Curated annotation (Swiss-Prot):
Claim: Cytoplasm is one of the keywords in the record: yes
Sites where the protein binds substrate: N11, N65, G75, N76, N158, N191, E209, R210, G219, T220
Principal cellular location given in the protein's record: cytoplasm
Protein name: Diaminopimelate epimerase
Pathway: Amino-acid biosynthesis; L-lysine biosynthesis via DAP pathway; DL-2,6-diaminopimelate from LL-2,6-diaminopimelate: step 1/1
Matching Pfam families: DAP_epimerase
Lineage summary: Bacteria, Bacillati, Bacillota, Clostridia, Thermoanaerobacterales
GO cellular component: cytosol
Marked site positions, Could be important to modulate the pK values of the two catalytic cysteine residues: H160, E209
EC number: 5.1.1.7
Alphabetic keyword roster: Amino-acid biosynthesis, Cytoplasm, Isomerase, Lysine biosynthesis
This protein's encoding gene: dapF
Summary of the function given for this chain in its UniProt record: Catalyzes the stereoinversion of LL-2,6-diaminopimelate (L,L-DAP) to meso-diaminopimelate (meso-DAP), a precursor of L-lysine and an essential component of the bacterial peptidoglycan.
Top-rank lineage group of the source organism: Bacteria
Source species of the chain: Carboxydothermus hydrogenoformans (strain ATCC BAA-161 / DSM 6008 / Z-2901)
Length: 274
């Protein structure tokens, strides 16, 4: 099986093109992703990403996390597959439509390996995120291991709990991340973002991804952070989101789509023996 190793700010993926040859159609993708993503016994990645034929878009993207679970959407992965598709199939076409479990996502391939993505409008209704609260899911108290946090829940096609803190230096991500991810308030689990505000135009973020753990970057997470920060009155429309792997640039006007801009890098290509 031929593959590409790609990453968006260190959030890395094994990318497999199944558009013309569906070699994996009868494979257990959950088991395969666990093996491929293992950093000692496999290739090593945060997820396995497949490009598949689509009847309603340029192609379909599926993302299987390193734990074998399937994600609805991934902002870093969508940038990677958009760059790959344009370079492989249609260099003249810069604006794409990609079918995902979160709906049709619209990336635009720019110069210098940058990709701008229309992430769609954020979902803010509790039952649609989903989060088990009756009220608007803004600044909701949550206690884990005796530590009280306040989260704002946002869905960018996948659920996020955004937590603003005074300093990220005090946050033990590996300690609190998995407990918040699996908290009963989140029926489908959740991604978790801890956020330190540097200015109305710049934030620093640690990410705990549902199904992948601590990652160097998260595109939907960066988008959710800016949405939550705007709702709370902390942030302006254009924000640089500084992640461990680098910066993403997010734009959100109330009532409109969120736009994310960031890099997509090809590291190497190879063959994996099934």
């Amino acid at each position: 099986m031929e593959f590409l190793k790609m990453h968006g700010l260190g959030n890395d993926f094994v990318v497999v093109d199944e558009i013309k040859n569906q070699n994996l159609v009868n494979k257990n993708l959950s088991d395969l992703a666990k093996k491929i993503c293992d950093r000692r016994f496999g290739i090593g990645a945060d997820g396995l990403v497949l490009l598949l034929p689509s009847e309603k878009a340029d192609f379909k993207m599926r993302i299987i996390n390193s734990d074998g679970s399937e994600a609805e959407m991934c902002g870093n992965a969508i940038r990677c597959v958009a760059r790959y598709y344009v370079e492989k199939y249609n260099p003249a076409k810069k604006q794409l439509e990609v079918e995902t479990l979160a709906g049709i996502i619209k990336p635009e391939v720019l110069e210098n390996n940058m990709v701008r993505v229309d992430m769609g409008r954020p979902i803010l209704k509790p039952q649609e995120i989903p989060v088990a609260v009756e009220e608007e899911p803004v600044n909701i108290p949550l206690e884990v291991l005796g530590q009280k946090f306040y989260f704002t829940a946002v869905s960018m096609g996948n659920p996020h709990a955004v937590i603003f803190v005074d300093s990220l230096a005090k946050i033990e991500l590996e300690k609190y991340g998995p407990l918040i991810e699996t908290h009963p308030l989140f029926p489908r689990k959740t991604n978790v973002e801890f956020v330190e505000i540097l200015s109305p135009a710049k934030v620093k973020v640690f990410v705990w991804e549902r199904g992948a753990g601590a990652t160097l970057a998260c595109g939907t997470g960066a988008s959710a952070v800016v949405v939550a920060g705007r709702i709370l009155g902390h942030l302006q429309e254009d924000v640089e989101v500084v992640l461990p792997g680098g910066s993403l640039f997010i734009n959100w006007v109330f009532g409109e789509s969120v736009y994310m801009t960031g890099p997509a890098e090809i590291v190497f290509k190879g063959e994996y023996f099934l």
